[in-house]
Regions:
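N-terminal transmembrane alpha-helices
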Residues: 10-50, 63-78, 82, 107-114, ...
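Transmembrane helical elements of multi-pass membrane transporters/channels
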Residues: 21-40, 144, 178, 207-211, ...
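Short runs within selected transmembrane alpha-helices of multi-pass transporters and secretion channels
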Residues: 73-76, 145-163, 171-182, 200-215, ...
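Generic alpha-helical transmembrane segments of integral inner-membrane proteins
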Residues: 27, 31, 35, 39, ...
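Helix-terminus/linker motif at the lipid-water interface of multi-pass membrane proteins
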Residues: 31, 35-56, 125-132, 188-195, ...
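Short alpha-helical transmembrane segments in multi-pass integral membrane proteins
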Residues: 1-23, 83-148, 194-249, 307-372, ...
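Small-residue-rich hydrophobic transmembrane alpha-helices
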Residues: 55-115, 152-171, 267, 281-339, ...
């Protein structure tokens, strides 16, 4: 199968063609993956009588779900660029060791997170801002979802190693299997069997299990470089790889964890300044953001293995061209989407809820939140380049800068100190986009480009 299957050749062909060849299947995969969350929210919002309340309650669970995904990406997102760099250097034994180390860490952390989450789900949800009425829906959803932690982490954390070998279509299929299953199972468990919010969680973990099974089937049998769990005598040898994986993956890990931190802070402030209705508004905004960011993530992830491979192969011209193509694609797309958000916000909001009261508050909030969204591109591009080229310190620093040092303080400063109420919560995002995104991108230009020039000498 792997010999006959079409692969993206990261070393040859046009850079634009390679990026599109990797990014388009990833875009389909990202869109399908988005369906896991989007479809869930659409169905939850339409549960008779309790839809809006249940939507807000499940929104409170998102930070914990993001934390689980963050750990999967810590090992997968940290290991895959190192895997690609080793392949570019023609060091395939090292590449396999990196992949096996990542897989072992994904599995061990998955079990630990599941047990911890099940034991402390209720106090965690209360910490995240769940009221007594919200716990009625949030707690059963989270308890069921946590049972699928391990397959969820395998599906997310090991998929990058499929893409890093050039099998982007296979990577897409691994996501498609779960997404299609979720589309079928959601209405069955929610409405036909009458499980309500519990049905959403059951459908999700069953779908994620199917995706994980496909990923393991391919990586253990069909891929060129195969994965397995580390043996006892390999653990000491893998320690160095583990440190490099974690240090490089820490940037994406911090970004996702700080996204959860921001969501927690926003929910806490909104519950005081606006009530439960504004937590539902933030859930809608988060859903819209996931929707419009999906192609951006696909382009970034499609470009990343090409950057890593050619950097390892010492081909600076292809690295530089990849950065330029990445920038053009993302900026054009974001410009179109930003205009759509500002001009027709109602269309995007109606995808998730038709509640008129919610619509009234969500429209101005959405415009405020996305006011400077195009500057976020600068952050994404800089972060992708830093991570792909194994620039750990820069990747980690800029992950912390925008969220921890800018957004979180502003989330409290603007509503309480500047007396801006709920508006302050939503406006904290564009302010951070302008400051954090600009600094990140300028730093990338001033550090990476000179290094590539020296590599040519």
């Amino acid at each position: 199968m792997s010999k006959n299957m079409k692969r993206v050749d990261f070393e040859n062909g046009t850079v634009t063609g390679n990026i599109l060849g990797a990014a388009l299947p990833m875009l389909v995969a990202q869109i399908l993956n988005l369906l896991y969350n989007i479809v869930d929210r659409v169905y939850i919002a339409r549960i008779p009588e309790v839809g809006t309340k249940a939507l807000g309650a499940v929104g409170i669970c998102f930070p914990l779900i993001v934390i689980i995904t963050a750990f999967a990406n810590l090992f997968g997102g940290g290991g895959a660029p190192l895997f690609s760099i080793s392949r570019g250097k023609r060091q395939e034994r090292e590449a396999v060791c990196i992949m096996n180390t990542s897989f072992s860490m994904v599995c061990v952390s998955g079990v630990i997170l599941m047990v911890t989450g099940v034991l402390f789900a209720r106090p965690i949800l209360i910490l995240f801002g769940a009221s007594k009425s919200a716990l009625v829906y949030a707690y059963p959803y989270m308890m069921i979802y946590l049972l699928g932690t391990l397959p969820s982490m395998i599906a997310v954390g090991m998929n990058p190693f499929i893409n890093a070998q050039g099998y982007s279509v296979v990577g897409m299929l691994s996501v498609a299997i779960g997404a299609v299953a979720n589309l079928i199972l959601d209405p069955l468990f929610i409405f036909v069997l009458g499980f309500g919010v519990r049905g959403v969680a059951i459908a999700t973990i069953l779908s994620q299990t199917l995706s994980a099974a496909f990923v393991l089937f391919f990586l253990t049998g069909k891929a060129e470089l195969k994965v397995r769990f580390l043996r006892k005598n390999e653990i000491s040898e893998s320690t160095g790889y583990a440190k490099n994986i974690v240090s490089l993956g820490m940037a994406g890990f911090i970004m996702q964890l700080t996204n959860s931190l921001v969501t927690i802070c926003c929910n806490n402030v909104l519950s005081v300044t606006g009530g439960d209705i504004y937590i539902s508004v933030m859930t809608i905004i988060s859903s819209v953001r996931q929707l419009v960011e999906t192609p951006i993530h696909a382009i970034n992830e499609g470009t990343s293995p090409i950057l890593s491979y050619n950097y390892g192969a010492r081909r600076p011209a292809r690295v530089r061209k990849s950065i330029a193509v990445l920038a053009v694609m993302i900026l054009i797309y974001t410009g179109v989407m930003w205009g759509s958000i500002i001009m027709i916000p109602e269309v995007l909001i109606r995808i998730f809820s038709s509640d008129k009261t919610l619509m009234k508050d969500a429209v101005p909030a959405l415009k405020q939140y996305f006011a400077a969204f195009i500057f976020m591109d600068l952050q994404y591009m800089g972060q992708t380049v830093f991570k792909s080229l194994n620039k750990k310190k820069q990747a980690i620093f800029f992950s912390l800068l925008r969220k921890v040092f800018i957004v979180v303080p502003l989330t409290y400063l603007m509503p309480y100190v500047l007396h801006m109420g709920t508006d302050g919560v939503f406006l904290a995002e564009p302010v951070s986009n302008v400051i954090g995104g600009s600094i990140c991108f300028i730093t990338m230009l001033c550090t990476v480009m000179p290094e590539l020039k020296r590599m040519e000498a």
